[in-house]
Amino acid sequence: MHNQTEELSIEDYKLDLENRIRNLLWTVSGDYTLDVKPDVSLFLRSREIALYDGIKQGAFAKYFDKNLLGLYLVKKIYLDASEAELTSLAQLCIEGAVGEKICEERPGVRHMRKKALEDILDQEYETLPSYDRLLDRLKIAVFRDVIAGSVQPVEKKLAAFRDRIYECGKTEDTMELIRIIDNLYNTVIDPDFEKKKGSLERVMAVTLEELTEFGWEDYLNEEMYEDALENYVEKITERMTDLEDASLTED
């Protein structure tokens, strides 16, 4: 009986946390119809990361078309882009697009944002990445700027890519943001992508029929096999506003 009560109280605690995160999201986005899945495991790893992820999810939905961006990512992955690297790059660009906007609208978020990025650096980058891991070095450079409150000196090549991330903050529509993500992927991650697979126009021209016929099972857990495409699009769309490495967040 004691164990049952304990299980119940853990469930109650999780539900309470879910409600808190959900309410915060709704408040920031101003959209109370937003379908939100709060990440309680992440909250237990770092309160600030979970809340900041949630706030950013709400803010992104307010300023941009999250479904259009999610579909772009899935189409690019369909054409053999690296899921992990493309998602990680998109996450960084989304941070560049809405991070500062949220802080200007709600000054209280600034401290939470800094603490969230500090927690990610502490938990994921105990040792600095090697020189050839450009995306990780770019992520660290952007995080350090936010934490310091000013642009920090970095090498010329890295600075040029970092400037592109900051250009995301000036974007007015989703397609503009997609262009920056696509350009950065084809420069930082896979300089041969366009030659092998085609331009952004080719990516966006991938049809729903092509996507539906593709076997997304390799990218999903077994219980998600049914309606695989729909589940995969949902999974990518949910993950793209995060910044942390989800594999470190245990249930």
Q: How would you describe each model-predicted region?
A:
Residues 1-169:
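Basic/hydrophobic alpha-helical interface regions
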Residues 141-251:
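Negatively charged
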